[in-house]
Design a protein with these regions (language model features):
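Acidic/polar-rich alpha-helix caps and helix-coil junctions
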Residues: 1-163
Length: 163
């Protein structure tokens, strides 16, 4: 996980080549030899994510809108859709999602990047049909993302996070 974290930091700082190098070291170690390609170029990653639709209430996809991120990039800008930076961050998030499956760490990425969450519900078992119910969306800006501060901190005159 340290390599993925370092890759994310390098990409956010504008060192796309350094971030990609760390991601390739991780994929070479994580993916089994002979079963899949284990190193990727920036152009290949960008082409892959450019071809995917963004996830929304009607489309299931590993590609998420990252424009609501709660941080700025190294130059003070925000994440722009369709750029190499966005594609590499999408790849970082996908690698981390695979690596930390069932560990509960995805929540931090969801909060940091302001990712909308869609809860898909199977509506027809025979047809393998899914939909997002009306109450099945947690927007990236939803205050339920906020973590409650402990009572000791509130007693010390710190204001509780809005929820």
């Amino acid at each position: 996980e340290a390599l993925i974290n370092r890759a994310e930091a390098k990409i956010r700082l504008g060192d796309l080549a350094g971030g990609l190098a760390d991601l390739n070291v991780w994929t070479q170690a994580y993916l089994r030899p002979g079963l899949a390609k284990r190193t990727f170029t920036q152009a290949e990653i960008k082409a892959y994510y450019d071809a995917l639709p963004y996830a929304d209430k009607t489309t299931r996809s590993p590609k998420k809108h990252l424009t609501k991120a709660h941080f700025k990039l190294h130059d003070g800008s925000t994440i722009t859709e369709g750029t190499a930076t966005e594609a590499l961050l999408q790849y970082v998030l996908q690698c981390r999602r695979i690596l930390t499956l069932h560990e509960g760490l995805r929540w931090q990425d969801i909060k940091r990047y302001g990712i909308d969450i869609y809860r898909w519900k199977k509506i027809d078992a025979g047809a393998d049909t899914f939909e997002v119910p009306a109450d099945g969306v947690l927007l990236g800006s939803d205050l339920r993302h906020a973590i409650a501060l402990p009572q000791q901190a509130i007693t010390g005159q710190i204001q509780q996070n809005p929820r």
